[in-house]
Amino acid sequence: MVTVTINGEKREYAQGTTYEAIAAEYQKDYEGMIALVAVNGKIRELFKKVTKDCLLEFFTLGDDVGHKTYVRTATMLFLKGICDVFGAEAARKSCVEFTIGHGLYVNTLGMAPVTAQSAEKIKARMLELVENKVPFMKRSYPLEEAMELFREKEMQDKEKLFHYRMSSLVNIYEIDGYYDYYYGYMLPNAGYVKWFDVMPYEEGFMLLLPSKKNPTALEPFDERRKLFETMESSQDWGRKAGIETVGDLNDQICSGSMSDLILIQEAEQERKIGEIAKDILDRGNVKFIMIAGPSSSGKTSFSHRLSIQLRTMGKTPHPIALDDYFVNREQTPRDEKGDYNFECLGAIDVKQFNDDMVKLLSGERVELPTFNFKTGQREYRGNYKQLAADDILVIEGIHGLNPEMSYALPEESKYKIYISALTALNVDNHNRIPTTDGRLLRRMVRDARTRGSSAQRTIQMWPSVRRGEEENIFPFQEEADAMFNSAQIFELAVLKTFAEPLLFQIPKDVPEYYEAKRLLKFLDYFLSVPSESLPNNSICREFVGGSCFNV
């Protein structure tokens, strides 16, 4: 017998008892379905067995690592469904691209008819596997053997990925004869995937899954058309460039052609910024450019580059930060924990902002405020503005797309831009890179360089940042007149050099270690690219340093 400690309670179990069996006894104490377990601080899948005295901590679908496990498992189940309904080639070539709302978009690239009937067939096969609780089997293969397995199955994307792996073993999952590789943990069997739906969408299917906030129910699909088109455009650019996966990128690095790739991508981004500037001019009456996006999107560099484009077209842009319209500290709303909530709309003096902007629009001379972050007070320091015929205001802040932020301004006077780092690169066809991972790594590298902040601190506060984005930015994405994707297909290979030493500093006995370990494993797929190759106006420079802009 072995002694297991859970939530301060000690119990004895026979050696060889699965963590799944132990979790079943404790499930009643947890609101969400248990998905994983930490054994003496190390995450383990539930099918593993207890072998000695240990301390256990369970993770549910409401935890980040548990929710990721559910999504990963449902993805493999979905691809198994495609394999059984439309054949192995259809599953092999299908690409898991990105999320829209709580839907995971899988592009079948013409390998399956995109119809409601097809979606029902895939779903029906998935439900069969769920009902029969078909297990996900995990096996460690020697690296060369794993490469040979995927070579036989014509999964060149995975074979290429493993070519650059340093580890000697690779974990491969199998369900009912279908083999695949995933970078992360899985649930024990298909019976755990209780909440999902499948619908046809564009060139593939949308796999609808529950959110971390509401993990036991499906929410209606929130179609975000502009966001989809922006992300799919970036995916298409990667396909045309021949860089769809990390293996493709590593091939480019080894071929010595990275300098060309960097210049091509930078030129592509500059072209898109120029198109946005031209659209602004073509509208004729725009006086206020409202720029918003989530943390570490590169808003500041983008604003500078857009301003340069506008200058080439005869406009005189003036930057304004919505942060300067913060209410005085004592008036700032507090969150449910009693802490100041600087990210809600109530933290901004919306009325004063609108009053000032309306006066500027009518040609008046206005003294604009400056917020003193040390004293927590708004100050007036003689910063007067008066708009001439060719003047235009570039306004940056998280609430820029919210109609309430600029309620008094005529719609024709505003041009709204949504910017985010929408990673188009995949690890391989079936392992996408969440856009939040790229932004988290950007934030980590920048905060360490400019604020002396540790990676542990950045990871610790990231959930709070994400909640603010979900509440204040993402609901207004589709209000944008233009969307700009600031992600660069090579940037994770550049960030790797800066991020890895920061992540290795995180001790093993803190909660943030789990996320640090995941990110280190993720970065291990990439070869490094030196930052010296980046031009000094690159958006990536905002994070790694060396920008010609005041960022």
What would you call each of these model-derived segments?
Residues 299:
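Conserved lysine of the Walker
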Residues 302, 306:
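Hydrophobic positions on the alpha1 helix immediately C-terminal to the Walker A/P-loop
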